[in-house]
Amino acid sequence: MRDKRQNSLAAASPFPKPASPLSLAAPTTTGLFALSLAIFDLDHTLITGDSDYEWGQFLIERHIVDGEDYERKNDRYYEQYREGTLDIFEFLAFALKPLADHDRRTLDAWHKEFMQERILPMIPEASRQLVDKHRQQGDTLLIITATNSFVTRPIAEFFGVHHLLATEPEIVDGEYTGKVSGTPCFQHGKVERLHQWLLEHNETLEGSWFYSDSHNDLPLLREVEHAVAVNPDEKLLAEATRKRWPIIKLY
């Protein structure tokens, strides 16, 4: 059952005023609240842009890929993602190819530059405060993202979040193959991957939170006890308003 804190944050009409992010998390007074799982989407939720798209733009800027063709495809796939029409396997064949074309040492060096130039400027202080609030409460922190783990693991580490569920690029003999390993962490795939993780870590969704900006995450938002829309897109805003989910702005 949704608690009174969430109901008090619900919309009145027709679009709710964003709630304060730090007012949402439950206190941890002994005997009143159990520790919970706090799940965060990454792109356009904890950061102000899309790390997958920005990695592509970084590759273009450095002339690592064919600029004109790659940018056209990168833009098209990004729009398909926003519209909810993305063929995830077609996209991954495109997005993971540069990983297969270069050795790990080179890729890791590029990623350090990518973090400094493109990712760190996209991390608002409010995002760090929200993650820290759940950390201080003793909650288990998890970032879940459709973007591949090569791009996102260093970002999760920057937030101090050790648990990451991301689309996994296949690795053979220490190098990327350009193929995907397992289920892509996208739409219903996020639910599948999360339930597998829950079994492996002896966790449950009791008292769980999930913060996301995207209608692509509606399957998972409907699974948790406390769904929170963060700077939501139009479709998620409509659903959050209808469901009376809290709506917050982090940037």
Report the location of each language-model feature.
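Ala/Thr-enriched low-complexity intrinsically disordered regions
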Residues: A10-A12, A19, A25-T30
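Alpha-helical substrate-recognition element adjacent to the catalytic core
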Residues: L24, T29-L37, L42-E168, T177
